[in-house]
UniProtKB/Swiss-Prot annotation:
It is found in: Cytoplasm. Zn(2+) 2 binds at residues 91, 125, 260. It comes from Schizosaccharomyces pombe (strain 972 / ATCC 24843). InterPro entries: 5'-Nucleotdase_C_sf (IPR036907), 5_nucleotidase/apyrase (IPR006179), Calcineurin-like_PHP_ApaH (IPR004843), Metallo-depent_PP-like (IPR029052), Nucleosidase_C (IPR053828), Pesterase_C1039 (IPR014485), YHR202W_N (IPR041823). This is Uncharacterized protein C17G6.03.
């Protein structure tokens, strides 16, 4: 199933990569995409990053650049006489000021995304945490897609009918221009923490639902798409769905399009079922192609050689190349084509770095012709929205780069270390109880990105920590006989996954040196070097492997444990945490005590400010204002 790739070298402008690495790249080395009968561009876990990564050339494209790319690729697909679909698999919200500063959060970014020509979309868990976001998505965003926004296991309370109703369509059946009949069936991962107006239904109960029986009764399906907000590996929900579908569609090709764990990944389930996951934060565009679908029909009349890529065109070209094909009759050629149509299905995948240079390379366009009117409209809309939200105005000056995962958790250059050693002890302060030794505990998934050196604004603040609803509570006077075991117990308690923790977001990297891909003398940027079930050749751009260190599961600041603290078991300490972590902490403390001592009702508000700036998101600008120079604001 592993496709043969055509390798290509192209020259690009010299640019400086992320300042963490201080390296330059004189040449961008890119792999060509493999086209098939059905091709899919895939996005996932965008999290509001529609403006792209302006300070990182590897992922510098905005949504407007992507829109232009999609339009050019659709034109290219038409030239090649093949199908091209566009699919997104959820988590459009929570992650940037552009997304999170509007009321309701994500309403402006949803309006911009509505300009995209998506064929299928599904919800992620971040569409479902807040009732305002869920209701806005249900009432104003989902109807725009006319039955192509899928939510097999999500119900929402509709106040107009006073009952729970499907959040989106359970499934969709449609045919492509080339006569491929597709069943698309999408769902979200099982998670806790959804707003009270939303119900996430167990995937294990799908086969008991009336709509499931209606869906699987369609036997003339040529291709099954499973766009789902789940990882493509080690997801029990996906295992259940694949097993159930294979009962009814034992030989139908299945393409899974996953998400949630923020990595590039590809999985092979059986000889006709595969899955791709396409990263996060507008860093990656996934690409899959599928060949060997018998129902596929060329839109160009067969004349010895038809379309540029399909099975018919490939076989016709081979017949022309081989001498004996010249002597074959048209009937023999037709027979050969029919035989090819019954051959086994094949798949390929690529991971495209989200930048204009790569988009131009793959769409065979130039800078002068790349931007489309739609792309420029969206880019202008992003700029105006950022301007209106105050995102273009710097509010602080970072003295250096604080890395997210490129350095160890406790390194002084780590964003986690900054929060643990500086922000929590110095900003999260309750004057009436600050003298009492206390822990400040946050799940590390509450930190979602690093911070570059120099000026930063509200957009960067939300990129580091977008959880505006995370405010701090205290559990008072907990005996040291219990709390002395708490730091160790936290790290052995498992990941707190409901808030989409990023401990599972590691790119699956390899030490492959790509000797067969480029000359050793050519320099590369740091970036994704993905190893998946198809090997090491999926990344469209050759990179050096980015250093990656897993964070601890929880950030735990110990404050006030000075020489006066004796460590006697009868001493008491306070435990401070945001509301999201409280149920986990209660569970851990009760297990240490071996009895049910604590519940959420025992926690009291700890850190408040008259100006309302007391959430996790507010800590960074508050700290910067007090402890960092402001010189960059006046340059």
């Amino acid at each position: 199933m592993k496709p043969a790739h055509t390798f290509s070298l192209i020259f690009s402008l010299l640019f400086v990569i992320n300042p963490c690495y201080s390296a330059t790249l004189p040449l961008a080395i890119r792999r060509e995409l493999t086209w098939g009968q059905v091709n899919i561009l895939h996005t996932t876990d965008i999290h509001g990053w529609l403006a792209g990564h302006a300070r990182d050339k590897r992922y510098s494209g905005d949504l407007g650049d992507f829109a232009s790319f999609v339009q050019h690729m659709k034109h290219l697909a038409k030239q090649k006489d093949v199908d091209l679909l566009l699919v997104d698999t959820g988590d459009l919200h929570d992650g940037t000021g552009l997304s999170d500063l509007t009321d309701p959060p994500g309403s402006w970014t949803d309006s911009l995304l509505a300009n995209m020509d998506y064929d299928i979309l599904v919800a992620g868990n971040h569409e479902l945490y807040l009732s305002t976001v869920a209701n806005d998505t249900y009432h104003n965003f989902i109807p725009l897609w006319e039955g192509r926004y899928l939510a097999a296991n999500i119900d929402i309370y509709d106040e107009h009918v006073s009952s729970f109703v499907p959040f989106g369509d359970r499934y969709a059946i449609f045919s492509t221009p080339h006569n491929v009949k597709i069943l698309a069936f999408g769902f979200v991962n099982s998670f806790s923490g959804a707003t009270d107006t939303v119900r996430v239904l167990p995937v294990s109960q799908f086969s008991l639902q009336p709509w499931w029986n209606d869906m699987v009764s369609n036997k003339d399906i040529d291709l099954i798409l499973i766009p789902a907000h789940v990882p493509v590996h080690n997801a029990s929900e996906l295992d259940i769905v694949l097993s159930e579908l294979r009962i009814h569609f034992p030989t139908t090709p299945i393409q899974v399009l996953g998400g949630h764990s923020h990595i590039r990944d590809y999985a092979i389930y059986d000889e006709k079922a595969v899955g791709i996951e396409s990263g996060r934060y507008c860093e990656t565009v996934g690409w899959v192609s599928i060949n060997g679908i018998p129902s596929f029909k060329s839109l160009v009349k067969l004349s010895g050689i038809s379309s540029l890529m399909g099975v018919e065109s490939y076989l016709a070209e081979r017949l022309r190349f081989i001498g004996e094909s010249i002597r074959r009759s048209s009937q023999q050629i037709f027979s050969s084509l029919q035989s090819a149509k019954s051959a086994s299905v094949s798949f390929s995948r690529s991971y495209i770095d989200w930048n204009p240079e790569g988009f131009m390379f793959h769409s065979k366009t130039k800078k002068s012709s790349f931007n489309t009117s739609l792309g420029e409209f969206i880019s202008n809309g992003i700029y105006e929205a950022r301007k209106a939200l105050g995102l273009l105005t710097p509010i602080g000056c970072s003295p250096k780069k604080f890395a997210f995962s490129e350095v160890p958790f406790n390194d002084s250059n780590s964003i986690y270390h900054l929060f643990q050693s500086e922000l929590f002890p110095k900003i999260v302060v309750n004057e009436s109880r600050h003298h009492i030794p206390h822990y400040i505990i946050v799940n590390s998934g509450g930190i979602r990105g690093g911070l570059n050196s120099g000026a930063f604004g509200l957009d960067e603040v939300f990129q580091v920590c977008p959880f505006k609803s995370n405010i701090f509570y205290v559990l008072k006077d907990v005996p040291w006989s219990i709390t002395k075991y708490l730091p160790q117990a936290l790290q052995h308690s498992g990941y707190l996954i409901a808030e989409d923790t990023l401990q599972i977001n590691t790119p699956q990297v390899s030490d492959a040196k790509f000797e067969d891909f480029y000359e050793h003398s050519i320099r590369k940027t740091y970036g994704y070097t993905t190893h998946d079930d198809l090997g090491d050749d999926g990344d469209d751009t050759a990179h050096l492997t980015t250093p990656h260190y897993e964070p601890l599961r929880f950030i735990c600041s110990q404050v006030g444990f000075d020489d006066s603290f004796s460590g006697d078991d009868k001493q008491v300490v306070d435990v401070v945490a945001p509301s999201f972590v409280i149920p986990r902490l209660d569970d851990i403390l009760n297990k240490i005590a071996d009895k049910p001592l604590y519940s959420p009702d025992d926690w009291e508000l700890y850190f408040t400010r008259p100006d309302g700036k007391h959430s996790m998101t507010d800590l960074l600008p508050l700290y910067a204002d007090l402890y960092w120079d402001h010189d960059c604001l006046y340059k």
